[in-house]
Amino acid sequence: MKKKKFIWRLLPWLIVLAALAALVVFVGIPLFTPEVPRDIPAPQVAYFEGDETPIIMENDALSFEMDPTTTHFKVTEKASGREWLSNPADADSDPIAVAANKEMLKATLSLTHATQAGVADMNNYKYSIENGTYTIEQQEDGSVRVNYAIGKIEKIYMIPTAITKERFDTFKAEMKKSTQKKLTSNYTLYEPAKLDSKKNKDEIIAMYPEVLNQALYILKSDTSENNKAKIEGYWAESGYTAEDYAIDQQLVAGSKDNSGAVFNVSMVYRLDGSDFVVEIPYDSIRYKEAYPITFITPLPMFGAASVEDEGYMFVPEGGGALINFNNGKLNQNSYYANMYGWDYATRRNEMISETRLNFPVFGMAKNGGSFICIMEGATSYGGVMADISGRYNSYNWLCGKYNVLHSDQYNVSSKTAQLVFMYEQDLPDDCITQRYKFIDSDRYVDMANAYGEYLRQQPEMTATTVSEQMPVSVEMVGAIDKIVVKMGLPIDSVVATTTFEQAQQMIGDLTEGGVENLNVRFSGWANRGVNQRVFTDVKVIKQLGGEAGMKNLISFAKDKNANLYFDGVNCFAYDSGILQGFVGFSDAARYTTREQVKIYPYDIITYKESDWLDPYYLAKPSYAKENASNMINKLSGLGAEGVAFRDIGFLLSADYNPKALVTREEAKAMNVETMKEAQAAGQKVIIRSGNDYALPYADLITDMDLNGAGYAIVDKNVPFYQIALHGVKDYTGEPINLANDTVEQFLQCVEYGAGLNYTFMAMDTKVLQDTLHSGFYAAHYDSWKEDAVATINRYQEDMAGLNQQSIVDHEMRDSGVAVTTYEDGTKVYVNYSERMRRVDGVTIPARDYTVERGNGK
């Protein structure tokens, strides 16, 4: 008995000791233990020593010609003779650009690096090309590699800083008399016997100790760079060589080094059939530990269009967007958006707007021709930026920009405002790759079809199929979490909003009402509902009907030829702790600061974190992958044939824990493995939004963003992505009944050839009061079912046979009518205006659409 009492008394102390041990292991040791010095290769500096002979690559479709004195180049399409320049030819005469902006116009690369004071930008024109600190190699495979040393580098001239009097006189004798006098005027003779008379005696002895033994000529310290170049010519006249320079430099005890920020970056150019490819291997990047490189931008001015050019820039915003040349929107921000959205493993203290791109393509059309650039390698580190003429220079330009080393700020102490930046330990094992495709057309439809052809040629896409009928997606909200008062006490409870039996009734209503190609996404079916707990153990919610009710629903959906998918989130841990199998110390992803990624909802008023609400965690990728496997296995065991990933294929985040780093590219590969696993288990797959790397494994893409974020600099939204995918993949827009303007959302689906999407729940939406699920405010099924069935039936009947066809044309008429043309000649007219319109002899009612069949039908 006494022993048991002793154990119970000891238990709290054991818990405290365990907590302290965890604090030391996971916080104290990482923060205060000195890191093992990293072996970062030092940047190397080499100088261009070639001649001015152009460097040429050529094949049947393209020719590439580089000026070795600037590394500027042009790519010529042989069929059309159209030339694309790496940099504007007349940058120096730009009337708007100041000196720094002219340097940027002449750069083929720019980078951002950290300093003690913050960050700084460098371009490779001012800090490499102008100084000749680069080398050019024509490699065995025919590609051209340019190795840049970028930084404030003091140029090395082949002139001796110090030389013995004997050697000085010998070389001087080989010069003309006029040259001898000029040379001698730049040197001072120091002799051992006369050193005491020199004011800088100690400095001279420290730098040139041999002066104590013999007379030396020493270069004057105030010699200018221009004068050094002239002196180099004098020495060259005497036959002075690099070997001589090496001998004389041995007299120098201490030499100046390039102690500032210096970087090595290599760019590789190659021709691949009719495509031009540029690469930046990450293993070519060198930097000093004091100056981590954070961003890199290849070819920022490729194809830049002047104020005289006509055309537009294409950016992958939403389904696609155009920015007209010289549109005069200088009061608006320039364009920038992140590829695949935010990386949740990087900190943000406020969220004003969410930028995301689903497909890595940008392009430009001008003067009858165009190109698209596909960001093939290191894509997830990238973003797209674009700007118009008149802001910094007279050119319209766009390019890709890539994150290299990620960082976050660490608050050292609550007693000080000092913040320390902590960076990734090592460079990713990746290679930036950009593929430029040239199109003999300036129509965005042709640019989109070129991208579509590229997608179809990818090996993973060869087995994809598309439905004959336009798809319909219906999300049914199963259960939510809510604080419910029971016996006078607030209890965190699970509330059923659509039971499995009610879902059967809804599926029956829709299919019996004539809806075809119905895809049902059932969310909130396990682990406490929509904001589910982690899937370490998958438990079907009993309030919905339990496993028996779920099996009945699966069987019923099969009988009705409806595709049934069960939704789940695996990347986040909501309301999960040790009892649910989630341990933050070991299972949460980490920032570069080594802190766990803890996320709070953002306030819609202040845009800052709502830290009074419950947080949730970003799971480390391996933990998320394991939970996704548990979900897939559970569904297979219950006889389900469809899995709907709420995050995989849509969100993409890294884990910057230095002890187990998972880059964003590695996380992407893990997501692909998960989707392959689902396929191998016989599951169909739904993804949201449609990140390009997930396309081959998705049977349906829902919730595609057709609008984008609404950047003011954009002039026009276009269905670029949808044109590329139509006839290849089934896709839908965002839920019509949850949109701010339901008619507008429906009409956009018609214009973009997208399936229709709805979100329903059986219970009245009053149940959402006092919850965090107000986004379902318009999801009450009974309020929508008649209108939804009528809308779907009309749409599927009007669009019958078009889902498997490609889109061959698209245009927006001045009257506010969009016209989409399919391969059989069928035209779909969508009237966004408040008045009836007549276009091409076709009458389109206000805020409605009309389908005119092709081939005389």
Question: Where do the protein language model's features map onto the residues?
Answer:
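N-terminal Sec-pathway targeting helices
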Residues: 2-17
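Active-site-proximal substrate-binding groove within the catalytic cores of carbohydrate-active enzymes
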Residues: 27, 59-60, 66-78, 96, ...
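Ser/Thr/Pro/Gly-rich low-complexity linker/stalk segments immediately outside membranes or between
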Residues: 29-49
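Carbohydrate-recognition beta-sandwich/jelly-roll modules
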Residues: 30-37, 56-497, 504-518
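Short solvent-exposed loop/turn micro-motifs enriched in small/polar/acidic residues
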Residues: 48-50, 129, 260-262, 812-813
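Aromatic-lined carbohydrate-binding/catalytic grooves of carbohydrate-active enzymes
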Residues: 467-555, 559-624, 650-654, 660
